[in-house]
């Protein structure tokens, strides 16, 4: 039993021992260590650890016959080990401040690094000395300086868990030099103590680590391997972002309904409708899925839960989000009014300029007003302007007698001849029933916001205050007395610019021979046919723009570009139609399910003028019935009368008691 101790004691005393010799000694000592006593085992293990730290195979230690030379300037001393060489440089060449020989400039070879402290220069010397005392616990790589090891450990930040997570039935991968514990660090001095114990595999019956399996119980902590379950925090962030995006769409939809109620834009203007719907198409609306009302249902689970399944570092499930109710669609009347506005917008989209022109409703000979007066946002010319010649306003009668389809831009598809002023009218849609004035064409204050005014969709009762000669046309289509021939001047200029191009067509033809008799024109017919050649005909009569192949390619490209533009416009039109249908289905679903404020809705319905003949006015007066007996008197005669109007109600309120006995 004393032989192993005698063998190991010289190994600790002799410093220049190679790595292979120390490892062979540790291998030969391992069998007696198992059967030896505790004291002998600890002594042998400590000796093997000291030998491994003193001369590891990656440290670059010299062989017993080699020595390390000091390359400091003017020094030729040789040291047996890296430790002794490092101590030699620090004590002899660097010195100390207490001994008054401190040197802060490195003179190793051609290095002239200068520092400000002794600790800095001693740390710098480790770069030149082949001494690597700092080892990585993950891969076993050794480094000269601790800061180098710190930088190296950061590379294991992503894959450290995977490296330290053993597979079922395998040995501990943290043994750095093979499966034999005698090589490298000894098991007694290693950071992970149970090195030879196999990893229990009952916790890994499912194979690869699964992040969303909540049925597996948490495994006990084992120091031999790291935890393979990460804390999933990305789910909460993604869910929060999804909730924010849906809330933005929800608020935008509520604002859109509010604009409809306040008539902020004209539902009969195709340009205004398209521009307003464009803001909703770019957002994720919560109603596009076709489901029920979103504010009455909780958000889905991925929105609120921070991590799915079992995650030791995950957050507890948070309560589901609830969107607030829409403030602009609380009552039943709001839903009905908004549905009517959406129907107007739907009719506007279906009956825009392109569809009306395709149906043949537009006038083929009508030219349009100069672009400076119309403020149109679309590139297509309006097809509802009158012809250039002025006619009497009474001619609008037979034209408006037909149920002409109204144009989405605010004027009917077949407007009267004097309706050009509807493009520059400064009146808002709200002021149409109350005003009887047509703004002059030079007053264009509101034309940018309201480029087109509703005309064909207005009821006939709104034009009752106008003269009979113009009662067939709505107010926005009446011709004003402030014309000053502006319309005639603009349209005449357009025709004058187009006519010279038409006159160039008959110029190449020789019209001088057409006035002569057949006898004078017949004799020179043969001489003219003889010199005529295909080249001469192509040069004089054929348009050069139609002869080249390059022009044909340009024509094809132009046609293709026009086709693409038409396809894009069709796609935009389809998107607008679908969005309007979704909105109308949403309003209809709320009306069917009764998802509105019932108290205020019933109150508003009971206060409408239509509720008088039905007897619903009694329900409004149910509260004051029990207190005064006289409060019932004005209610009964009103319920019995069929011709009760608002002026009559005010009269009843004044002297209701006097009419009660009658």
From Swiss-Prot:
GO terms for biological process: positive regulation of transcription by RNA polymerase II. Residues 1-42, 370-541, 595-662 are annotated as: Disordered. Residues 404-438 have a biased composition (Polar residues). A motif (YPX[LI] motif 2) lies at residues 646-649. It comes from Aspergillus parasiticus. Residues 498-523, 595-619 have a biased composition (Basic and acidic residues). SMART domains: ZnF_C2H2 (SM00355). It is found in: Cytoplasm; Nucleus. The keyword DNA-binding applies. One of its GO terms (molecular function) is DNA binding. Belongs to the pacC/RIM101 family. Activated by C-terminal proteolytic cleavage by signaling protease (probably palB/RIM13) at neutral to alkaline ambient pH. The lineage of its organism: Eukaryota, Fungi, Dikarya, Ascomycota, Pezizomycotina. This is pH-response transcription factor pacC/RIM101.
């Amino acid at each position: 039993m004393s032989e192993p101790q005698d063998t190991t004691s010289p190994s600790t005393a002799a410093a220049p021992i190679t790595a292979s010799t120390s490892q062979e000694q540790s291998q030969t000592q391992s069998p007696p260590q198992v059967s030896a006593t505790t004291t002998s085992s600890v002594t042998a293990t400590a000796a093997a650890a000291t030998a491994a730290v003193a001369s590891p195979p990656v440290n670059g230690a010299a062989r017993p016959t080699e020595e390390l030379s000091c390359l400091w300037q003017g020094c030729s001393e040789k040291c047996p080990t890296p430790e002794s060489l490092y101590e030699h440089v620090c004590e002899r060449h660097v010195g100390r401040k207490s001994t008054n020989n401190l040197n802060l400039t490195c003179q190793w070879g051609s290095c002239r690094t200068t520092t400000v402290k002794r600790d800095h220069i001693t740390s710098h010397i480790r770069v030149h000395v082949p001494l690597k005392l700092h080892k990585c616990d993950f891969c076993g790589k050794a480094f000269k300086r601790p800061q180098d090891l710190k930088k190296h450990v950061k590379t294991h930040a992503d894959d450290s868990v995977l490296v330290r997570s053993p597979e079922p039935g395998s040995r501990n991968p943290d043994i750095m030099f093979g499966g034999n514990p005698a090589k490298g660090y000894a098991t007694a001095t290693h950071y992970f103590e149970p090195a030879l114990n196999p990893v229990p595999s009952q916790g890994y019956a499912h194979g690869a680590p699964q992040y969303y399996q909540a049925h597996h119980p948490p495994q006990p902590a084992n120091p031999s391997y790291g935890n393979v379950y990460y804390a999933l925090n990305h789910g909460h962030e993604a869910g929060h972002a999804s909730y924010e995006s849906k809330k933005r769409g929800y608020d935008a939809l509520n604002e859109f309904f509010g604009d409809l109620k306040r008539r902020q834009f004209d539902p009969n203007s195709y340009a205004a409708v398209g521009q307003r719907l464009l803001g909703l198409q770019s957002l994720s609306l919560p109603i596009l899925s076709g489901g029920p009302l979103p504010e009455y249902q909780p958000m889905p689970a991925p929105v609120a839960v921070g991590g799915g399944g079992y995650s030791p570092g995950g957050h507890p499930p948070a309560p589901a989000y609830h969107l607030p109710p829409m403030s602009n669609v609380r009552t039943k009347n709001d839903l009905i009014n908004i549905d009517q506005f959406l129907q107007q917008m739907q009719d506007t989209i279906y009956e825009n300029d392109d569809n009306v022109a395709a149906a043949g409703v537009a006038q083929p000979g009508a030219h349009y007003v100069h672009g400076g007066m119309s403020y149109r946002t679309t590139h297509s010319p309006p097809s509802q302007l009158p012809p250039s010649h002025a006619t009497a306003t009474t001619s609008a009668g037979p034209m408006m007698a037909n149920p002409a389809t109204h144009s989405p831009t605010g004027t009917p598809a077949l407007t009267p001849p004097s309706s050009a002023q509807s493009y520059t009218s400064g009146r808002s849609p709200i002021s149409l029933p109350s005003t009887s004035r047509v703004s002059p064409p030079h007053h264009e204050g509101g034309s940018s916001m309201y480029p087109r005014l509703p005309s064909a969709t207005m009821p006939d009762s709104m034009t009752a205050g106008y003269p009979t000669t113009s009662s067939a046309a709505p107010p926005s289509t009446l011709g004003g007395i402030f014309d000053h021939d502006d319309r005639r001047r603009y349209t005449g200029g357009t025709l004058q610019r187009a006519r010279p191009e038409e006159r160039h067509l008959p110029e190449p033809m020789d019209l001088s021979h057409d006035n002569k008799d057949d006898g004078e024109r017949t004799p020179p017919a043969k001489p003219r046919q003889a010199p005529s050649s295909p080249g001469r005909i192509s040069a004089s009569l054929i348009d050069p723009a139609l002869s080249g192949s390059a022009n044909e390619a340009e024509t094809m490209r132009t046609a293709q570009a026009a086709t693409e533009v038409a396809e894009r416009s069709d796609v935009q039109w389809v998107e607008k139609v679908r969005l309007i249908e979704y909105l109308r289905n949403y309003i209809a679903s709320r009306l069917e399910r009764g998802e509105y404020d019932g108290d205020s809705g019933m109150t508003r319905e009971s206060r409408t003028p239509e509720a008088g003949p039905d007897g619903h006015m009694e329900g409004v007066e149910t509260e004051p019935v029990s207190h005064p007996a006289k409060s019932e008197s004005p209610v009964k005669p009103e319920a019995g009368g069929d011709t009760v109007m608002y002026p009559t109600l005010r009269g009843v309120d004044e002297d209701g008691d006097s009419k009660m006995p009658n």
